[in-house]
């Protein structure tokens, strides 16, 4: 993880067949570029999937190409 900071966002899109998706989020009230995530970074039991407009919490890590990605993604309960 880049740092221990956690962020909240909303799933914009997730393709279970493709194995990745994007989260809409903001930092300090400023909208950021949608954050990429890989299904392996979803924290849950059973089948790892997310749905459009689900609220999530996540950290930020770096992928193998040195680009930021969401990690430790957890669905927020209502």
Q: What are the language-model segments listed below?
A:
Residues 15, 43, 74-77:
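A generic structural motif
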Residues 61-78:
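OB-fold/S1-family single-stranded nucleic acid-binding modules
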Residues 18-24:
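Short aromatic-glycine-enriched beta-strand elements
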Residues 3-17:
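Structural detector for short beta-strands of small beta-barrel domains
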Residues 43-57:
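Short nucleic-acid-contacting surface segments enriched for D/E, G, S/T with interspersed K/R
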Residues 31-46:
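Beta-strand/loop nucleic-acid-binding surfaces
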């Amino acid at each position: 993880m880049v740092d221990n900071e956690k962020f909240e966002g909303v799933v914009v899109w997730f393709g279970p067949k493709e194995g990745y998706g994007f989260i809409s989020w903001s930092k300090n009230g400023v909208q950021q570029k949608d954050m990429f995530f890989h299904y392996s970074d979803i924290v849950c039991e059973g089948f790892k999937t997310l749905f459009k407009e689900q609220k999530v919490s996540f950290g930020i890590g770096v992928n193998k190409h040195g680009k930021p990605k969401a990690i430790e993604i957890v669905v927020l309960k209502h």
